[in-house]
Amino acid sequence: MAKNIQFDIEARDKLKKGVDALANAVKVTLGPKGRNVVLQKSFGGPQVTKDGVSVAKEIELEDPIENLGAQMVKEVASKTNDIAGDGTTTATVLAQAIVREGLKNVAAGANPMDLKRGIDKAVEAVVNDLKKQSREVGGSNEKIKQVASISANNDEAIGELISVAFDKVGKEGVITVEEAKGIETTVDVVEGMQFDRGYQSPYFVTNSDKMITEFDNPYILLSDKKISSMKDLLPILEPVAQSGKPLLIISEEVEGEALATLVVNKIRGALKVAAVKAPGFGDRRKAMLEDIAILTGGTVISEETGSKLEDTKLSFLGKAERVTIDKDNTTIVNGNGKKSDIESRVNQIKAQIEKTTSDYDKEKLQERLAKLAGGVAVLYVGAASEVEMKEKKDRVDDALHATRAAVEEGIVAGGGVALVRAIKSLNGLKVDNVDQDTGIKIVKRSLQEPLRQIVANAGEEGSVIVAKVAEGKNEFGYDAKLGEYKNMISEGIIDPTKVTRVALENAASVSGMLLTTECVITEIKKEEPAMPQMPNSGMGGMM
């Protein structure tokens, strides 16, 4: 296929048009008074969003070179979203500003490579300054609520729910977002370890009203094999029956004679017992059984470790304060495991998370970590219509990611103030030539842009407010929601440090690539000739 090759100013101008087209659509969403964007979907109703990356992902331009520019900035938004989970609009605004200022200087004869070196030096200095400005969130529920509220577009109800969820499950816990059946948005917390396997027979139910099995202080037998013969279980069932405590059997499966005998004994009242299948599959099943063993202070009966069911003693069994089983899930609360063993297992899983490259494996390891270290909270998002539901769910997801980022790296003053304060760190930065110094000045100017855009979206004059905020010190900034100057941190207008840092790093990285582009090669689309009309296709004259 033939190619279209464009060089120099023509190529860069078209790339800039693409950057501007995407950035202008995204940046209307920035700040407390940012507007919504409505996206047409190929199926279903339209999607209404204030999420920068959702807008960016929808944009495809007709001109291939302009489209390349748009795709490069789309990469900024997507990468920021992947790493920090929020800050996509800020990253897009920064990228547009660096490209705009940079291309002006390239057109005026500056060396693009030196401009890029200057930009990179400036970004490094700003990131170090952001780290100095950063404050730890610690266990402060109020700070978590503020971060979540701002990221959910100043929705305090969502902020409150997320802070409750974090309070219950801790920073290692898993918080998932589901669609609610009604219009209420609620949080549901599962204490202890829950896995998605229910009782193997409804005859094990102890509470027939709720159709659940409830055990207090049960013994827990863990095995990685199928149990089909009763003689394997007899040696352990006798001492358990004498102790008067219930028994939960977690194995690959209890079947045949063994299951029938357990059910009969349960119905007669001779034994309080229930059997559930082990969670997961293959190697993951073995790992999860080991997790349960560590949590409950038991031992997995496995031929791999040389232990057999018929040799099982009471000391091999785990214990827990309470176990609840329904037809789909089993929950173990307050296992009897040693704290030191659980901590070393948690550290082992954390190390595996660091090493793994697969997103799926990472997600599964994260779930295991949560079940061991904290718990699981589910946020049920309710709304009156499906369109509102999707929009709200997006905001809750953003808020959740932002909160995790804040817990991880701390917080800085929000509303674009932290970036404005970081400008001073660029004064007197050592450079090798004038063009590198110009690169630093480009970043200085660009750091004001998020604040300028927040103010513009609120209908105010950006330059005046940027100048006044720049004159101030520390956390002094502009609250665009109320139109007042305030201390941003004490007013709860805060951003996660990680989000601000990642937004700037990604914006500078992609902008640098774009500024140093000298040639663009695209495909020339052939015009497909129209299909010739078949004779008599109008059926005219036919009887």
UniProtKB/Swiss-Prot annotation:
Entry annotated with the keyword Protein biosynthesis: no
Pfam family, one: Cpn60_TCP1
Binding residues annotated for ATP, in chain numbering: 29-32, 50, 86-90, 415, 495
EC number annotated for this UniProt entry: 5.6.1.7
InterPro entries hit by this protein: Chaperonin_Cpn60_CS, Cpn60/GroEL, Cpn60/GroEL/TCP-1, GroEL-like_apical_dom_sf, GROEL-like_equatorial_sf, TCP-1-like_intermed_sf
Protein name per Swiss-Prot or TrEMBL: Chaperonin GroEL
Record keyword Nucleotide-binding present: yes
One record GO biological process: protein refolding
